[in-house]
Amino acid sequence: MVAQVQKQAPTFKKTAVVDGVFDEVSLDKYKGKYVVLAFIPLAFTFVCPTEIIAFSEAAKKFEEQGAQVLFASTDSEYSLLAWTNIPRKEGGLGPINIPLLADTNHSLSRDYGVLIEEEGVALRGLFIIDPKGVIRHITINDLPVGRNVDEALRLVEAFQWTDKNGTVLPCNWTPGAATIKPTVEDSKEYFEAANK
């Protein structure tokens, strides 16, 4: 089964680079937290380090929201470790604050529907998985375009808000902005205020 919104996320257990050493990382390890699972095509390329570094630098913001960021690549754990040992000025990652999962057998990329089979690399997929293990959001970019950290964080906050408060969120919602009560009668309050 390929990953789908509103369905249980495919489980996994992979060797990862965590704080400069190899460790086993599984989805089950993060039960009870939101997980932002992102895929990259290849280590030692051009867009990928910009994404990993940006998400790594925002790791604390995600943690504060009860979320864990994970990045996965079809590269080996050895290649990913070597990449973290190269300075950022030279296209490396340097020390990072998020796990890098090695999907060497491509099962994770395949299960999440991002594997380009003939090339053996993953598209830039981003999946938000809730504390119950249900996929709440999927985006998949073509290879040349990176993702937006602020948007990923906003989406985590948005799903947390709806889970807690039962309201729905309009286009361009940000924390603190107006929400919509999801009934025909109650929603009028939002629409009247938004369309003065």
From Swiss-Prot:
- UniProt-annotated location(s): Cytoplasm
Q: Does the keyword Nucleotide-binding apply?
A: no
UniProt cross-references to SUPFAM superfamilies, sorted A to Z: Thioredoxin-like
Q: What about PTM?
A: The enzyme can be inactivated by further oxidation of the cysteine sulfenic acid (C(P)-SOH) to sulphinic acid (C(P)-SO2H) instead of its condensation to a disulfide bond. It can be reactivated by forming a transient disulfide bond with sulfiredoxin SRX1, which reduces the cysteine sulfinic acid in an ATP- and Mg-dependent manner.
GO molecular function of the protein, one example?
ribosome binding
A biological process from GO: cellular response to dithiothreitol
Recite the UniProt keywords alphabetically.
Antioxidant, Cytoplasm, Disulfide bond, Isopeptide bond, Oxidoreductase, Peroxidase, Phosphoprotein, Redox-active center, Ubl conjugation
Report the InterPro entries cross-referenced here.
AhpC/TSA (IPR000866), Peroxiredoxin (IPR050217), Peroxiredoxin_AhpC-typ (IPR024706), Peroxiredoxin_C (IPR019479), Thioredoxin-like_sf (IPR036249), Thioredoxin_domain (IPR013766)
Domain Thioredoxin spans what residues?
3-161
- Catalytic residue list: 48
What this protein is reported to do is described as: Thiol-specific peroxidase that catalyzes the reduction of hydrogen peroxide and organic hydroperoxides to water and alcohols, respectively. Plays a role in cell protection against oxidative stress by detoxifying peroxides and as sensor of hydrogen peroxide-mediated signaling events. Protects the cell against the oxidative stress caused by nascent-protein misfolding and aggregation. Relays hydrogen peroxide as a signal to the transcription factor YAP1 by inducing the formation of intramolecular disulfide bonds in YAP1, which causes its nuclear accumulation and activation.
Could you tell me what this protein is called?
Answer: Peroxiredoxin TSA1
Species this chain originates from: Saccharomyces cerevisiae (strain ATCC 204508 / S288c) (Baker's yeast)
Instruction: Report which gene this protein is encoded by.
Output: TSA1
